[in-house]
């Protein structure tokens, strides 16, 4: 993120990395684990297993940031204790998947590719029969869909889509449009919001070993490697940073420009932003009331209107 800095503020004095420096017990009370879910268990079962692994620690609650089918693999963000307060951010975020669509007949690659491309943009979807939600038709946005490889009747797809998109149903619909029928045989989630599989996913086994190393030997090295501060959820979000006047107590329903010391240069009027204090702790989500340059220059006026406060997560300085 590129920041515009308020004139006169010593940016070098800001400690935006402070959330990583908190005691391990505090990190566990507001942390996120990026699990590489394996084929087999449900997302609920995985969260329950991890909760048991953390017995003997401050962790009493483990949620997850978006259901993966039992047969699906890939990124499953796990939310420890207070991190559950940002679950809605992850659930509503953009997702990416790689999967294998098996065609029920022989179709030339060019024909498959041309039909697949027609599914880019808004599509109508009805959740599958076994879905936990009401089976009503809804619109979902397919941002990008690419054929990575086709071998015979097997088509390797990469799909970037809006949250709530059923990739299995998408493949069925593509098969019907082609005319031969199709179904999904393998699915892996490669991105969830700001998180991608290149960012160091961990296995259930690695979590267990890390917890044991800390409880048995007092070695928190591995645990700090696998547990991330809740602020990581907002890594790819436009942000504003407020000084002591903006974070030294409960935030009002709006943020005054006089408290803003830095703002992402991409911010425009109406942009949803993450609000941090100068130590890097998350304070709120808000809607910017002006572009970035004005945020750091305008005197005493509304800079952003609060969408959701994160006082429950805690400003720890």
Residue ranges of predicted features:
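Accessory RNA 3′-end/elbow-binding domains used by RNA modification enzymes
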Residues: 1-38, 43-65, 137, 177, ...
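RNA pseudouridine synthases
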Residues: 1-199
């Amino acid at each position: 993120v590129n920041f515009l800095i308020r004139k006169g503020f010593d940016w070098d004095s800001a400690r935006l990395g402070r959330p990583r420096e908190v005691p391990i017990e505090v990190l566990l009370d507001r942390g996120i684990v990026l699990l590489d879910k394996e084929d087999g268990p449900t997302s609920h079962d995985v969260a329950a297993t991890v909760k048991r692994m953390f017995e003997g620690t401050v962790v009493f609650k483990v949620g997850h940031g978006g259901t993966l089918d039992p047969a699906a693999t890939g990124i499953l963000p796990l939310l420890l204790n207070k991190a559950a307060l940002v679950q809605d951010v992850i659930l509503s975020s953009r997702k990416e998947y790689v999967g294998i669509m098996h065609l029920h007949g022989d179709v030339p690659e060019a024909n498959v590719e041309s039909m697949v491309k027609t599914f880019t943009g808004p599509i109508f979807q009805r959740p599958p029969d076994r879905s936990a939600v009401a089976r009503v038709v809804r619109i979902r946005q397919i941002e990008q869909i690419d054929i990575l490889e086709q071998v015979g009747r097997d088509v390797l797809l990469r799909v970037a889509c809006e949250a709530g998109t059923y990739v299995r149903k998408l493949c069925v619909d593509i098969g019907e449009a082609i005319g031969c029928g199709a179904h999904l045989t393998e699915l892996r989630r490669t991105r969830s919001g700001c998180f991608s599989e290149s960012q160091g996913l961990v296995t259930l086994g690695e979590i267990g070993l890390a917890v044991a190393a800390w409880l048995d030997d007092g070695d928190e090295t591995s645990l700090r490697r696998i547990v991330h501060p809740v602020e990581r959820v907002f890594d790819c979000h436009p942000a504003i940073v407020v000084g002591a006047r903006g974070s030294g107590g409960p935030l009002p329903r709006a943020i005054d420009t006089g408290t803003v010391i830095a703002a992402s240069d991409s911010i425009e009027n109406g942009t949803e932003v993450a609000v941090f204090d100068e130590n890097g702790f998350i304070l709120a989500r808000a809607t910017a009331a002006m572009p970035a340059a004005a945020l750091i220059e305008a005197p005493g006026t509304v800079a952003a209107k609060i969408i959701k406060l994160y006082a429950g997560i805690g400003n720890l300085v």
